[in-house]
Amino acid sequence: MSYGIYIGRNLTADGVAYLAGYGDEPSSHWLEINPRQAHAEGSTITVGVTPQADMPGVLTEIPQAAETLRNMRVSYSYYLGVPAPLTNGGLNECGVAVRDHWRTSRKELIEMTPTDQTGPHYSDLARLVVDRAP
């Protein structure tokens, strides 16, 4: 289960927004500090989940951005069927913050999800935001 707390800048005495979160994944967590990086034209990154995930899927490649932003994020090492490292959330040099959230879906939505689904999962989306969002 994941939890997140957001307090907007209009609700704090100092005008600073706060974003916090907690995830109870059964794995190691660590802080990463990543520099701004240039990537070769045609580079890709792997996203998605494996057939072992609770909601199975297929790993796929998507284009890597030409440049990713300097950021710090919390990563973790394990969630069944999701390749490590996973991103809990973070903050980039532009002040964009993100926190991943996982929640189960309604039974009928789970049943209609194909077992060969592709595309970014919740942790991939958090990583993409801290890497790319200006």
Please tell me what each predicted stretch does.
Residues 2-123:
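A contiguous strand-loop segment
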Residues 119-134:
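A conserved hydrophobic secondary-structure block that centers on an alpha-helix together
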